[in-house]
Swiss-Prot record:
GO terms for cellular component: membrane; nitrate reductase complex; periplasmic space. Transmembrane segments: none annotated. It comes from Vibrio vulnificus (strain CMCP6). The lineage of its organism: Bacteria, Pseudomonadati, Pseudomonadota, Gammaproteobacteria, Vibrionales. Residues 1-30 form the signal peptide. Component of the periplasmic nitrate reductase NapAB complex composed of NapA and NapB. GO terms for molecular function: 4 iron, 4 sulfur cluster binding; electron transfer activity; iron ion binding; molybdenum ion binding; molybdopterin cofactor binding; nitrate reductase (cytochrome) activity. Mo-bis(molybdopterin guanine dinucleotide) binds at residues 85, 152, 177, 181, 214-221, 245-249, 264-266, 374, 378, 484, 510-511, 533, 560, 718-727, 802, 819. This is Periplasmic nitrate reductase. Predicted to be exported by the Tat system. The position of the signal peptide cleavage has not been experimentally proven.
Length: 829
């Protein structure tokens, strides 16, 4: 073996060190230590796998495995920082129970719903799936099949799945788990502006004078963004931080003012602020007159429950999203009852504190950034709350300029990029189009090369309705990808678990690990994770980021994209389309669904030579799959305010914020000079509306569906903690994160604990009409609820706390309220 002088010096240094330690090294071994490629770490960029912040990380790989990650110093989002979860990304793919081959419930050598999980080949898995799907399609039609996806799908995975369901199977029964986190934000954006997603960007953090958190614990849930707020606050003494919540948490530690309000009363607080602005002549009349219209929301709209539920039957206008035009004077009259006295009485927040908050919004010289996540969205009036905060910013003209921003923070890494922009919701198509609009269907059918009438006009079953339809045997074949809804979703015992185990139904779960959802399924498909595949995510500030595959997957695991595309080969077009459609498109006769969807001359037009050598999906299908899907998808938005850059560009940058026009990203939408779609001379142009004007929408306080009573005397709020991601599927398999927070606990006020004879660490039973869980109490932790409320995180699979949550939703967004339901707490003897 030839040795350079440099290697010789290194080898001798290693040998000398070994000799001092009393170890003898062969010369060849010393040489290997000095010069072997085995010791080299290769670094490449990728967006973080966890939240919607969109941090970029550098991934270190060695010998086909991820061995390290670090914050990307070139990334404008996180500037080299990571949160504690991000620092342990290298370990999420290597849990000891990682699934490596398909598992089918079998007895006596064949599928049996009551059988044991048995390893099978991919062919057996897909053949079994196809048999079940074909039987359901033949018997009941396309409404009998469904899919539940994810804001953690890559852009390409979500696009392929939505295309397969809506164009191939002709079923709109596809919905993402983003229904549980961002649906109210989506409807809020669409009602007020006509276009989804924030108008501002993360640059606002460096310009704002006041930050107002409406139901968001950013210190734990968006910690990297929280560092930017912290830096702004500590380096600029005039800056104020305001935190509103139903319980005390870590974000209060930085707050200049904290506001603990009674559950649901945020509606009253927001209306009070609007009233204060009007009463104190703080309305920006020039902005309001030029750029807004006023509407009244239909009220008494129910709670998205089953039609036969007594609460739903009581509603005068169940599920109505209708609005009527009103004047400013009528709007003024609608908020007038929300005086400081009334708002204080309803919320429990002191009058002087409410006035202090309102003044920050009213002061024309104070730039305000409002921020929210699940506290506002997971709310039976979440859409209204989104609108009420927009009202405040529109009344004052504090919008779409640096530091003035109502900013809906996203929970998942691609809830924006995939669930929302791609349109994997049951009612949506890409680029904010909807299935109910014939013009939108026509655009999709043209891009997808479909005959007219292919895409059904009726929205499919949303997430909560999917559970009910599985329970009732209406939905029979169901594919779950990239989420753990059996643990995360509401009312587990009442709807979901009976639906999964309904003998009429066949449930497929694609996941890297044996989650609670997987264990309730009939077939489990092992899934590739993160950089085991190529993909793209879209974060909360409209930033699209792409990454290359960097390691191979484990065992026989395959990406969700591979699974969708490969499964589509099992169907001839005659098995999924009626004769009248085939007559309009005879070129598809005898073809497979794969041929129609993915070998269509568009998706498959980029040769394999353009892909990297390590790209398992592309090498399997014989063309550059990810680029083809991305470029076809991008056709929907280009020229329509959702412009994306060419796919290859994203591999050369740390993301771009759409719309990207002539190679330039957009920081502040709707503002002339920043947004290329804003008309010249307009100042502001809310071009999502036909007249270019945003809506100020009047909506009152309405009570939650349930409240504590004599038997169930405590509020329960569920949520997350810093160390774990959602249900802990990944983070609980990282030893350091698991050891840091091994178990969920019940955070309770010391006086509530004392009244029940409880001490810190005691085990309690938390129960209500929907179930019960056992958990230990914590009276001194990071979360400190007021009397009458407890907080329990949902990451712990041993404590399925969300089984207690009522499956009531916002009737407009169909998003569940996980933040308030009545429970009782008793000590376990």
């Amino acid at each position: 073996m030839k040795m350079t002088r440099r290697a010789f010096v290194k080898a001798n240094a290693a040998a000398s060190a070994a000799a001092v330690a009393g170890i003898t090294l062969p010369a060849s071994a010393a040489n290997l230590i000095a010069s072997s490629d085995q010791t080299k770490i290769t670094w490449d960029k990728a967006p973080c796998r966890f939240c919607g912040t969109g941090c970029s990380v550098l991934v270190g790989t060695q010998n086909g495995k991820v061995v390290a990650t670090q914050g990307d110093p070139e990334a404008p989002v996180n500037k080299g920082l990571n949160c504690i979860k991000g620092y342990f990304l290298s370990k999420i793919m290597y849990g000891q129970d990682r699934l490596t081959q398909p598992l089918l419930r079998m007895k006596d050598g064949k599928y049996d719903k009551e059988g044991d999980f048995t390893p099978v080949s991919w062919d057996v898995a897909f053949d079994t799936m196809a048999e079940k799907w074909k039987a359901s399609l033949a018997k009941k039609g396309p409404t009998s099949i469904g899919m539940f996806g994810s804001g953690q799908w890559t852009v390409m995975e979500g696009y392929a799945a939505a295309k397969m369901m809506k164009a191939g199977f002709r079923s709109n029964n596809i919905d993402p788990n983003a229904r549980h986190c961002m649906a109210s934000a989506v409807v809020g954006f669409m009602r007020t502006f006509g276009i989804d997603e924030p108008m501002g960007c993360y640059d606002d953090f460096e310009h704002a004078d006041s930050f107002v958190l409406w139901g968001s614990n950013m210190a734990e849930m968006h910690p990297v963004l929280w560092t930017r707020i912290t830096d702004r606050r500590l380096s600029h003494p005039h800056v104020k931080v305001n935190v509103l919540s139903t319980y005390y948490h870590r974000s209060f530690e930085l707050a200049d003012s904290g506001y603990i309000f009674k559950p649901q009363s945020d509606l009253a607080i927001a209306n009070f602020i609007a009233n204060y602005i009007i009463q104190n002549d703080a309305v920006n009349w020039d902005f309001v007159n030029k750029h807004t219209n006023f509407k009244q929301a239909t009220t008494d709209i129910g709670y998205g429950l089953r039609d036969d539920d007594p609460l739903q039957k009581q509603a005068k206008n169940p599920n109505s999203g209708n609005m009527t035009s009103i004047s400013f004077e009528e709007y003024k009259k609608s908020v007038a009852p929300y005086t400081v006295e009334k708002a204080s009485e309803m919320s429990g927040v002191a009058q002087d504190k409410l006035i202090e908050l309102a003044k920050q919004y009213a002061d024309p010289n104070t730039k305000v950034m409002s921020l929210w996540t699940m506290g506002m969205n997971q709310h039976t009036r979440g859409v209204w709350m989104n609108s009420l905060v927009y009202n405040i910013h529109l009344l004052t003209g504090k919008i779409s300029t640096p530091g003035n921003s109502p900013f809906s923070l996203t929970g998942q890494p691609s809830a924006c990029g995939t669930a929302r922009e791609v349109g994997t919701f049951a009612h949506r198509l890409p680029a904010d189009m909807v299935v109910a609009n014939p013009k939108h269907r026509a655009i999709a059918e043209k891009i997808w090369k479909l005959p007219e009438g292919t895409i059904p006009p009726k929205p499919g079953f949303h997430a909560v309705l999917q559970d009910r339809m599985l329970h009732d045997g209406v939905l029979n074949c169901y594919w779950v990808q990239c989420n753990n809804n059996m643990q995360a979703g509401p009312n587990i015992n009442g709807e979901r678990l009976p639906g999964y185990r309904n003998p009429e139904n066949f449930i497929v779960v694609s996941d890297p690990y044996p989650t609670a959802t997987a264990q309730a399924a009939d077939l489990i498909l092992p899934t590739a994770m993160w950089i085991e595949k190529e993909g793209a995510y879209g974060n909360a500030e409209r930033r699209t980021q792409a990454w290359y595959q960097q390691v191979g997957t484990v065992g026989e695991a395959k990406s969700d994209l591979w699974q969708v595309m490969e499964f589509s080969k099992r169907f001839k077009m005659e098995e999924v389309w009626p004769e009248e459609l085939l007559a309009k498109a005879p070129q598809y006769r005898g073809k497979t669904m794969y041929d129609m969807l993915f070998a269509n001359g568009q998706v498959d037009k980029f040769p394999l030579s353009e892909a990297r050598q390590l790209n398992d999906d592309s090498h399997h299908f014989g063309f550059y799959v990810q680029k083809g899907l991305f470029e076809e998808y991008a056709e929907f938005g280009r020229g329509h305010g959702h412009d994306l850059a060419p796919y290859d560009v994203y591999h050369t940058v740390r993301g771009l914020r759409w719309p990207v026009v002539d190679g330039k990203e957009t920081l502040w939408r709707y503002k002339e000079g920043s947004d290329p779609y804003a008309k010249k001379g307009s100042g502001w142009d809310f071009y999502g509306k036909p007249d270019g004007k945003a809506l100020i929408i009047s909506a009152p306080y309405e009570a939650p569906p349930e409240s504590p009573d004599a038997e169930y005397d405590m509020w329960l709020c569920t949520g997350r903690v810093l160390e774990h991601w959602h249900t802990g599927t990944m983070t609980r398999r990282v030893p350091e994160l698991y050891k840091a927070v091994p178990d969920a606990v019940c955070y309770i006020h010391p006086e509530d604990a004392k009244a029940r004879g409880l001490r810190r660490g005691d085990e309690v039973l938390i129960s209500n009409k929907r179930g019960e869980v056992r958990v230990r109490v914590e009276t001194r932790g990071r979360n400190r609820p007021p009397q009458g409320l407890v907080f329990v995180p949902f990451f712990d699979a041993r404590i399925l706390i969300n089984k207690l949550i009522l499956d009531a939703t916002d009737p407009l967004s169909k998003q569940t309220d996980f933040k308030k339901c009545p429970v009782k707490i008793t000590k376990v003897a």
